[in-house]
């Protein structure tokens, strides 16, 4: 017999699926960014793309879900900076952001990021450098379209499923050039 089998009961016939009931997962426990600046709070000049120094950032994950690359893209010029992260955690990301800001000096005014847990230490970087961080709406990747498009282009060199353990900073610099 194919399909669900009927069961007789006092109320009527019910069909029992072989897959059973859908189980619901527990709520996310990965933490939330409290007091973050929303992307809608960015100055209007950022949206118009008339002024240099406004960046979008994200991480490109490797197959092992540990090693990844931090990408920062300037919104007007499309200039790309890539930093290798040994682990996808907030300490590594904050260090990489600080190195990128030092490398770019006064050319960074704002950075717009997604809500990943790796960016939860943004306040430390904000206190150390004259940069303001903004965060996109969760699951609205198109709000950082320049960065998402660039990450797609980076995937030509670092395809999905590739282990990034053996990628080093020199490789990242060569891809970004």
Q: Locations of the language-model features?
A:
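Basic, flexible linker segments flanking DNA-binding modules
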Residues: 1-47
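Glycine-centered loop/turn motifs
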Residues: 45, 49, 53, 161-162
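Two-metal-ion RNase H-like nuclease active-site motif
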Residues: 52-62
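Mobile genetic element proteins and their domesticated derivatives, centered on retroelements
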Residues: 58, 72, 78, 97, ...
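Active-site beta-loop-alpha junctions of metal-dependent nucleic acid enzymes
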Residues: 61-65, 82-106
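Short loop/turn microsegments at loop-to-beta-strand junctions
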Residues: 68-69
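Charged alpha-helix within mobile-element recombinases
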Residues: 102, 123-133, 137-177
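Acidic/histidine-rich, metal-coordinating catalytic segments
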Residues: 106-121, 139
């Amino acid at each position: 017999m194919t399909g669900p089998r009927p069961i007789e009961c006092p109320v009527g016939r019910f069909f029992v699926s072989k897959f059973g009931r859908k189980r619901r997962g527990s709520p996310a426990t990965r933490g939330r960014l409290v007091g973050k600046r929303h992307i809608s709070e960015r100055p209007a000049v950022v949206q118009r793309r008339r002024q240099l120094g406004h960046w979008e950032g994200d991480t490109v994950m490797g197959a092992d879900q540990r090693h990844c690359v931090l990408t920062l893209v300037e919104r007007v010029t499309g200039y790309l900076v890539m930093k290798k992260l040994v682990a996808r955690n907030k300490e590594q990301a904050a260090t990489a952001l600080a190195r990128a800001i030092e490398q770019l000096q006064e050319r960074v005014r704002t950075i717009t990021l997604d809500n990943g847990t790796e960016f939860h230490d943004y306040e430390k970087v904000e206190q150390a450098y004259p940069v303001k961080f903004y965060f996109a709406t969760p699951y609205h990747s198109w709000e950082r379209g320049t960065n998402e498009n660039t990450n797609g282009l980076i995937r030509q060199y670092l395809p999905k499923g590739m282990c990034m353990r053996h990628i080093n900073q020199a490789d990242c610099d060569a891809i970004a050039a």
